[in-house]
Amino acid sequence: MTNLAKTFSDRYKSIAIVGKGAVGSAIAQSLDYLSINYDVYDSSDIEEIFDNCYDLLIYSGVNASKYHADRNPVTDKLHCLRAYDIFKNISAEEKILISTIDASRSFEQSSAYGNNRRLLETKIFQDRELFGNSKILRLPALYGSTVKKNAWYDSVKGADSITLNDDLLAKIDSECKKYHLDRTNYNILSFVNPQSEFAWYHLDTILRTIDRVTKSNEHVYQVISYDEAHKSGLLISHKELIERLGYRVEFISDSKILKYQSALFDENVYLMFEKSERNMYDEQWKEILE
């Protein structure tokens, strides 16, 4: 049994994960690898969690789509308020909310995605019942085998950043059908400015990061992968990311330039570096994505 497995087995007899997306799946895979039992829930069966009591709750069920949040800010706010209610009412000795560095006070004040998640964090820490046993882990841009939609994944796969609705296409009249719809206009190269700079985190270290969070006395944490920070001075531009992955592409985006440097040094937030055995440029990741 590894030290990490022993730590979790000794400290936590019952673990609950909320969310089956990239982060929740990565946590579940790590626990499976260490042969540690857990329960996992999502929106389809979340009501069942209230019948149980856990030693550790890892809540990764907040919608991670910035695109949809910024285009539907009211709906997204209601989603975050619902997440607060769920988080509050789950019975657990220790609770960790998986959040985002977009929630930093020093970053993107106009973003509904960041503002709504900051609201969620604020409500948790203003709640006396939650403050004592709750911690927040803010993650940056992610990479790893469970990631299925972000700049890294789309750049490697050449995947569409949004999916055109079939009903919408069906409404195009016959006269318009003679024109070719260039789907590259909906690709990640259109939506991400090549000069935007991101901090990155490898999800294969997520359980080790959570272990560090549970053992520390801070309340809010931000983490990035040490290797990527060391190579890039904390941040990597999207253009550099593409080139390091071995691709030569022509960027066609004039989207807003985002630089996450300020978000990493938010006031009263503990910044952690996590060393991974892999990096985002490994050939094995390209194979996983084939």
Name each region found by the language model.
Residues 46-92, 100-108:
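NAD(P)H-binding glycine-rich loop region in Rossmannoid oxidoreductase-like domains
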Residues 116:
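Active-site helix of classical SDR
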Residues 61, 96-100, 138-140, 224:
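Active-site beta-alpha turn of Rossmann-fold NAD(P)-dependent dehydrogenases/reductases
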Residues 17-19:
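Conserved N-terminal Rossmann-fold NAD(P)-binding element of oxidoreductases
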Residues 97-108, 112, 142-147:
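Conserved catalytic-site region of short-chain dehydrogenase/reductase
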Residues 125-198, 205:
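NAD(P)-dependent short-chain dehydrogenase/reductase
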Residues 201-261, 266, 285-289:
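Mid/C-terminal beta-alpha module of Rossmann-like enzyme folds, strongest
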Residues 24-25:
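N-terminal Rossmann-fold NAD(P) dinucleotide-binding loop
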